Amino acid sequence: MTASHSLALSMTKSTSPLILTLTLSLQPPLKHPRKRETFQEIQAYPNAEVISLSPKSLMATNRFFCEICNKGFQREQNLQLHKRGHNLPWKLKQKTNKNQVKKKVYICPEKSCVHHDPARALGDLTGIKKHFSRKHGEKKWKCDKCSKKYAVISDWKAHNKICGSREFRCDCGTLFSRKDSFISHRSFCDVLAEESSKFFSVPSPLAANSTIATVTDTNNPILIQSQLDQSSTGTADLNVNNNHTTLFGQKFTNSNPTQQQPNALALSSPPSPRSTSDSVHNLWKLQEEECAHQWLLNEYMNNNKNIFHKGIFKNQEDEIKKGNIYSGSNPTDGNIASLFSYNQEAVNMASFSATTLLQKVAQTGTPSSSETSTTMFGQMTSSIFNNTMLNSYCLTAKNNEEELTRDFLGVGSSEDQQRLHRHRFPSSVPLTANHDIPKLAATIVGRKQP
């Protein structure tokens, strides 16, 4: 006898209800079979008769027919009752304890189905019919509201009763009739939306480009539109309004020197190796697009000289003569530099490629025609030439219409170009109208011309 049993016997001698309660609690709990095991025990019929019906006979509406009128019945009992009307001998099956009827189970006629195994057979003829229709049959019944199809008419009727009464709509537009399905889908949809927002929130380094759009003046608004192929050349914005100039996503403000902000390059933080490599890659992409934009603007200004108002760049011209725009503390210098690079070190890393391009210019010689100038302009992507030409287009203008359009290098014969050259190349030779392009390129790269 175990210790637990002896404890129980000693406690039963007392009549105290508390001790009796303790005695009952010490009894070992009864083990109840799990639902899965109970289901398997019910479905398992070791002595049952296994019946295999063909798909045709299984899906037949009537399996029993009258010999006289050929009327069909689904059950044999109904046929026997029908025979009484024809005065035929009929007999109903009666249950007796003497002759025990074997249980009948039905297997699925589809060999690949799990219920084709006799151990997984279904014990109801109606159940095997519905199973075969749902899993292997044709769905003939369609809901008029949600267009769902069903193979069993009872399922279709049950669906019609609740269809449209309860709807759970997700933000993505999906409808659910069950709340659990909606909750599981919503959790997945929220995670997907969060990841998508993180992806699209990353700013693109080339996002500052848009269509060459507007040149506005206070008195004479002029709209210039140029249709560009956005997939190949990108877009750019040029907005001039009084003392504010916006070019290719960068804003320049011409104000007094006392109101100027610190240089953008001076405020930039030291770059990391990864950001420096990205800056070099984005530098050349921006320069290639900039060349295309400036060439288009040049061509458009040559063809439409008369549409520009002569006083549209007056403020910029006055500032050039005063020497404010190209002063060392002007934020325009930093803004123009930041247009082509994120910091000064990125420009220095790209100097090797610029030197190679300048050597090509020195070898090819001076362009002799406008076509050659256009070709040479497309080849030169150095930030030196791009910045020079950018300033000549956007920050200078003359009363003479012929001087509105600068050459592609921006090295005109005006005194403003001399100031521009001294600002950009303080240690180089002075720039004059008689300078040759190969000599200029050779001077920059340190090559001596014969």
Swiss-Prot record:
PROSITE patterns: ZINC_FINGER_C2H2_1 (PS00028), ZINC_FINGER_C2H2_2 (PS50157). Probable transcription factor. The modification Phosphoserine is found at residue 54. Zn(2+) 1 binds at residues 143, 146, 159, 163. It comes from Arabidopsis thaliana. Residues 178-190 are annotated as: SHR-binding. It is found in: Nucleus. Keywords: DNA-binding, Metal-binding, Nucleus, Phosphoprotein, Repeat, Transcription, Transcription regulation, Zinc, Zinc-finger. It comes from the Eukaryota. This is Protein indeterminate-domain 13.
